């Protein structure tokens, strides 16, 4: 899952993006939002900067189709809620993609 795609330490390259390999992209986490360019970010970005044209809105405008995930950060707290009709790997994965 592309993780904080809009900061300069982990930038998501939409030219190389393939939804077959990464059908989910992180839209929000404790550091801030990657929904659109210049979204509000946590004031302590660990020395990182936000990079334009790497937001999820930018990817959607380019025609990509992907699901969103959001969660906390580090130490196992990055939890995503899923509504699935079947409690199987295929059912859960199908619900988020």
How would you label these PLM feature ranges?
Residues 1-97:
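Extended, charged catalytic domains and RNA/DNA-binding interfaces, predominantly
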């Amino acid at each position: 899952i592309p993780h904080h795609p809009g900061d300069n330490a982990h930038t998501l390259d939409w030219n190389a993006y393939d939804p077959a390999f990464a059908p989910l992209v992180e839209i929000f986490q404790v550091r801030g939002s990657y929904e659109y360019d210049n979204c509000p970010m946590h004031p302590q970005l660990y020395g990182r900067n936000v990079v334009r044209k790497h937001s999820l809105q930018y990817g959607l405008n380019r025609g990509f189709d992907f699901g969103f995930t959001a969660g906390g950060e580090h130490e196992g707290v990055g939890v995503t809620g899923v509504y699935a009709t079947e409690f199987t790997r295929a059912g859960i994965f199908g619900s988020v993609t």
